[in-house]
From Swiss-Prot:
Enables the recognition and targeting of unfolded and aggregated proteins to the ClpC protease or to other proteins involved in proteolysis. This is Adapter protein MecA. InterPro entries: MecA_C_sf (IPR038471), Neg-reg_MecA (IPR008681). Pfam families: MecA. The N-terminal domain probably binds unfolded/aggregated proteins; the C-terminal domain interacts with ClpC. Homodimer. Belongs to the MecA family. Disulfide bonds: none annotated. GO terms for molecular function: protein-macromolecule adaptor activity.
Length: 217
């Protein structure tokens, strides 16, 4: 498992599916077994105590993302209390029964994948593309077949990131695969999430970003 300090308040975990198996878990356990996913979370937090000077006390925001070869988990100290749209506040300073119930609810909400049939007409799927050279982004803006994408451009730590959303009412699985293939001709799939970019990145072009890049460059 890899642990990366994003900033003073945020830690990123990356655990490969192979590492999961070596720890006695499998993907089915993590997605569908509440006790197993809770056990994995606490294992990660225990390991954090030895790897990083990060005190998991007070409310936390936790976001889980499934990648091709593993899981990415962001743990951020919240500046305010209360439940928000993208996380769940958890107090770990005293592991009493109430905290355990919050953890169970958090893990059930974040580790269980959304079933496609539960998505509404206006729901979207998200993809983050990383560019090391702005010229690649300019070239992408002129590509065909991407007109219905919802795009937003950020800069973060010296790189450019394009947050791409595929509206469910305009993209089926086949169309998404085709669009992603085009996107990957110009950039790299990023491990960052839209939440992280919105929180810590700088907006260069709001929606529709690709259209604006094409217009000005």
């Amino acid at each position: 498992m890899e642990i990366e300090r994003i900033n003073e308040d945020t830690i990123k975990f990356y655990i490969s599916y192979l590492d999961l198996e070596e720890r006695g878990f499998n993907q089915e356990d993590v997605w569908y077994d509440r006790e197993k996913s809770e056990e994995l979370f606490w294992d990660m937090m225990d390991e954090l105590k030895y790897e990083e000077e990060f005190s998991p006390e007070g409310p936390l925001w936790i976001q889980v993302q499934a990648l091709k070869h593993g899981l990415e988990v962001f743990v951020t100290k919240a500046t305010i209390g209360g439940k928000g749209e993208d996380g769940f506040d958890v107090t770990l300073s005293s592991p009493d029964e109430l905290a355990e119930e919050k953890i169970e609810k958090l893990l059930e909400e974040n580790f269980n994948p959304v079933k496609k049939e539960s998505l509404g007409e206006d729901d979207t799927l998200e993809f983050i593309l990383e560019f090391r050279d702005f010229e690649d982004l300019i070239s992408l803006s002129r590509a065909t077949g991407l007109e219905n994408l919802v795009t937003k451009l950020y800069s973060y730590q010296g790189k450019y990131y394009l947050n791409v959303e595929f509206p469910e009412n305009k993209y089926d699985e086949s169309n998404i695969d085709n669009a992603v293939s085009i996107l990957l001709e110009y950039g790299l799939e990023s491990n960052l999430t839209g939440y992280m970019l919105a929180e810590y990145g700088k907006v260069i072009f709001d929606v529709p970003a690709l259209k604006q890049v094409r217009k000005y460059f």
